[in-house]
Amino acid sequence: MFGMKSRKKSATLLLTAVMSLSLFGCSTGNTTTGNAAQPAGEGNAAAAAESKAKAAGGKLVLYSAGPQKLADNIVNEFTAKTGIEVEMFQGTTGKILARMEAEKANPVADVVILASLPSAQALKADGLTLPYPEAANADKLNKDWSDAEGNYFSSSASALGIVYNSKLVTTPPKSWADLATSAWKDAVNIPDPTLSGSALDFITGYLSANGEKGWDLLNAYKANGVAMAGANQEALDPVITGAKSIVAAGVDYMAYSAKARGEPLDIVYPEEGTVISPRPAAILKSSSNVENAKAFIDYLLSDEAQKLVTDAYLIPGREDIEATNRANVKDIPQLKVDWAWMSEHGVEIAARFSEIFK
């Protein structure tokens, strides 16, 4: 099921799965049963989710890329509304794909939520997704982030920026190129694109916009002591503590959330543009709880769930909703990226990047 059909067809999925397997094996996650109080709730999408779930009964198995608190809140509210027990594995996109690869002979998940659009595109290309074009509120989603045929739905997104320690950095850099200057020698981390779906989105997106010359910047980063430092949280933690000053391609919701908790962090979106990384959810064709999976997608796109998304400092996937606690899409300069190209070239780019930064 997950065999290498072609480099173009499932490149990102297989690269991330195989490399993550080598590092993590079959790591275990959290099993969560929603038990929150029944929310008031409004909206046709939530009603549709409740109706479908009551008709189906049973459970749902969800594999979800972070943030953990958001995933827990969505699961708890969905369970409170529908009575459906949700078993959740929570991890990075790489860990989720590795787990799916390990389970390919006996698939377990009903729904996956990933932090990388090309990974969802690869799932669709491999015929592993179950289309659900009639999902409630799907017509309100950002069309560039979701599948027109209903194979995946980006219910949220994050942008990649320059995240810095505001105690150490008084004049933050304004462009990606600034991080290759002597002012930031040995002071910068960057997440590992084989462990972070959003980091892979940034690197492939930057190269899709800048072509082969984009590698000049990445090579300059290496020469300036930029360190490839694990997944997103592992790259960010040394900046919070002051061991490093900056994360290049830092995930913005982590910065906003940490800043709200009182950590000395802030973020800059470089003037030449960045990548906004959608977070797609998909029903798997192998699901044994299809009606529950559809109900979950309906809930994920509901007003209630989108409020939970904005509370977690993420960009809502629906275009009719804006966050009030962070920058919205219109506020963020964006690179002109080609998602199809990014998906096609993910393997070679991640391998080349890892070779440079190893």
Language model feature labels by segment:
Residues 1-59:
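Short, low-complexity disordered leader/linker segments with a strong preference
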Residues 43-85, 258-259:
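Short, polar/charged alpha-helical segment
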Residues 61-71, 91-95, 107-244:
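Extracytoplasmic ligand-binding site segments that recognize negatively charged/polar headgroups
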Residues 118-122, 245-264:
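A ligand-binding cleft/hinge motif common to bilobed small-molecule-binding domains
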Residues 158, 218-222, 228-229, 261-285:
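Periplasmic-binding protein-like
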Residues 161-168, 204-207, 277-289, 308-309:
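A bilobed periplasmic-binding-protein/Venus flytrap-type ligand-binding module shared by bacterial periplasmic
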Residues 212-214, 317-358:
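An extracytoplasmic/periplasmic, membrane-proximal ligand-sensing/linker region
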Residues 275, 284-337:
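Mature extracytoplasmic/periplasmic domains
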